[in-house]
Amino acid sequence: MRALIVGGSSGIGLSIVLNLLGKEKYESVYVIDKAPFPEKYANDKVVYLPCDLSNGKYDCLERANDIHALYITAGFGHLKFFQEVSGDYIQNSFSVNTVAPLQIIRHYYDRMLSAEDFYCGVMVSIAGRLASPLFSVYSATKAALSKFIEAVNVELDVQGYKNRILEVSPGSLKGTGFSGGPSQPELTATLADEIIRRTELHEELYIPQYEDIFKGVIARYEADAHKYGVESYWYKKKRLEAK
């Protein structure tokens, strides 16, 4: 088997790569990323394909057509008041966080329209499901991605296919380097394993720490979205000021 991890040079994508490298059934693991694959984790199974998702060109996919699993983990976001956001930032955010995943999934979609297993997991974000002030652009990109996945999974179901796209929507994750720190795969290894497990079961939604944290958070949001948003605003503002 062969897998492709988009965004596999860092964060949760790197953890997924390392997990798959440990599985005998995977003979090759393609990594698409703007950043080089870390030399520290060099492995003969890894095929690194440089690609900048912000430019709208996906020629690199042609070198990874023979895959059986697809994990899309690339994405970025920054705490910003909307008045501080530039037009280029908005464009790049949607290009990387939303348009690229849709285009990549479309490239491999014929594999999903099959009786054979094709595994697909996509990192979204809990920010796409809640009011997220100071993360307005990021949450918008992820909300669009979430709704796309929901709709396509319905299409697959009604058309009689077993394959699904797993939406993974976590909150803040330690060890991913999302906020600028280094990637620490050992901190996200358990999560990576669970993402792979659920993807291979063709599940549709996984919210890590749902019972412990996000069940209550979502309930608060649904009870009074504006009140929740105001509380989120002040919480994020304190985080921004602490940097």
At which residue positions do the language-model features occur?
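Active-site helix of classical SDR
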Residues: 105, 141
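Conserved NAD(P)H cofactor-binding loop of Rossmann-fold oxidoreductase domains
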Residues: 73-79
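C-terminal helical subdomain
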Residues: 163, 167, 180-220
